[in-house]
Amino acid sequence: MITTEGTRSLETLDIEKLLSILPHRYPFLLIDRIVEIDGEQEAIGIKNITINEPHFVGHFPAKPVMPGVLILEAMAQTAGAISLLRLGNKQTNLVYLMTVDNAKFRKPVIPGDQLKIHVRLLKKRSGMRRFSCIAEVKGVRVAEAEIAAMILEKE
């Protein structure tokens, strides 16, 4: 995990910077900010979970729970943002999720939670990236997965 010890230079991305990097928009932009970036190696993203999100209407009306697939998407967006950030001209590239491996959902994520998404680059080869991802709420692991993504030029 990222620490603030030593001489690392850590970056952050607010919502305006994220909107300039990622193509996602409401209701499918699933990260609010990135609070720490260490090069292209690691990042921590934040998603504040609110009852106003459209998926809670049907998942589940009496006991709202964030769908696991949206937690995975938040992981992918965090990884994609740091990948695109390092490419320079971000507007000409897109990141496509290719695989999800070893996904585990350990605890429900509910309105009022703050999802903290840790991503760490495992492998980088030409346009492909593989990341280890962990999602936490209040320091407790709620989900984890390994994801692979491909960076391609927009056509």
UniProtKB/Swiss-Prot annotation:
Keywords noted in UniProt: Cytoplasm, Lipid A biosynthesis, Lipid biosynthesis, Lipid metabolism, Lyase
Protein name (record): 3-hydroxyacyl-[acyl-carrier-protein] dehydratase FabZ
Subcellular location: Cytoplasm
GO annotation (BP), single: lipid A biosynthetic process
Pfam family, one: FabA
Gene Ontology, cellular component aspect: cytoplasm; membrane
Record bears the keyword Glycosyltransferase: no
E.C. number(s) listed in UniProt: 4.2.1.59
Active site, per annotation: 59
Disulfide-bonded cysteines: none
Keyword Iron-sulfur: no
